[in-house]
């Protein structure tokens, strides 16, 4: 008899209901409720408790594992944006160290920029833009970084991870590296392609890394390549022609090219100085209405034009004799390139190369609207770049923004890689005094030296 009772009890504890609890646990909970309430109609209350299940039991919460360790780390990093940073502990006493006072900085309305882009159906979405706003706040308040201004540049997609890019200026001028002798000097900090310092992170809220300065050679080499980013800054750039640097340098060159071509402002919002080309806000600027801002003629390039030399201001070689005028063809076409004037309108941009069968080449910019109805008032309008897919400029009233979200690949015609260099001749010139024009083999110095034979061991 005792064995039968034990088997029955084990059966009740083993059988699970659809909610995950056993029959034994359900009966025990029902009896406990009857004994606790002690109702007059105990039998009916017991039947009701057994047949009905609590609302919480109907909600099964399965444990959903993270897709990968990187996804879990990204979720933790993004969650850290919504709370106070963890205090730094003193290694000797173990007590928290008083944090530094927040750094004072200026930034654009990142959340408002997200609303403008949402109106056009582009961008990252409100949830991700809100996290980008918190990341901008954290970067700007970091006293160790010492930034003066912060702007959210956009997002680059990668095969293994993505890049979130932040454009900043520093409160103090950093030390600039010197260009190697015989190369085109890079532009100093605060000017041209090195006017801003860029920080990137793979996740919003994750660790930030400062990108290096860009050189003219890196910009010129990046124009010959078309490749995807991996998401690892230390990854090598395996391509031909060889790129002088790793993926961090390649990403920085892409940012320089994209910012010079797609960061725009409404026409007339800034005025340029005739001598220094420095921009200043125009207090008399009157914003245009809705759909008028979808015309490229009403937008201007905000950053300086990037010339073929890889600089915004061309660098000319010094003539051999400074007292005499150089020859007519002493300077190359790159050194003589003038470029468009500051704040050139977008309608002056060259169209894209026409594809096979196209009678008219596609324009460099296309209009985008928040509504297909012309009568919609106060709607957001802007332009979208066809040369750099993913670059969008939006405007509503006095609020405008420019952002890039893409793969970092330039459009425009069919692309073919550069042909390999001509093969190196295996035979040298005929040596003097050799009869019959016999050619001698050239000694190759690239091979490692021949190893010495091993020493014989004494038996």
UniProtKB/Swiss-Prot annotation:
- Just give the chief location class: cytoplasm
PTM Asymmetric dimethylarginine: at which residues? Answer: 267, 398
Keyword Glycoprotein: yes or no? no
Q: Name one GO biological process term.
A: cilium movement involved in cell motility
Q: Pfam families this protein is in?
A: Radial_spoke
Show the segment(s) annotated as Disordered.
Answer: 309-330, 418-459
Which GO CC terms are listed, alphabetically? motile cilium; radial spoke head
Keyword annotations for this protein?
Cell projection, Cilium, Cytoplasm, Cytoskeleton, Flagellum, Methylation
Q: After translation, how is this protein modified?
A: Asymmetrically dimethylated at Arg-267 and Arg-398 during flagellum resorption. Probably methylated by PRMT1.
InterPro entries for this protein: Radial_spoke (IPR006802)
Checking CDD domains in the record gives: DD_CrRSP4-like (cd22963)
Where in or outside the cell it occurs: the entry states: Cytoplasm, Cytoskeleton, Flagellum axoneme
Q: How does the annotation summarize its subunit structure?
A: The radial spoke head is made of five different polypeptides (RSP1, RSP4, RSP6, RSP9, and RSP10).
Q: What does this protein do?
A: Flagellar radial spokes contribute to the regulation of dynein arm activity and thus the pattern of flagellar bending. They consist of a thin stalk, which is attached to the a subfiber of the outer doublet microtubule, and a bulbous head, which is attached to the stalk and appears to interact with the projections from the central pair of microtubules.
Family per UniProt?
A: Belongs to the flagellar radial spoke RSP4/6 family.
Could you identify this protein by its name?
Flagellar radial spoke protein 6
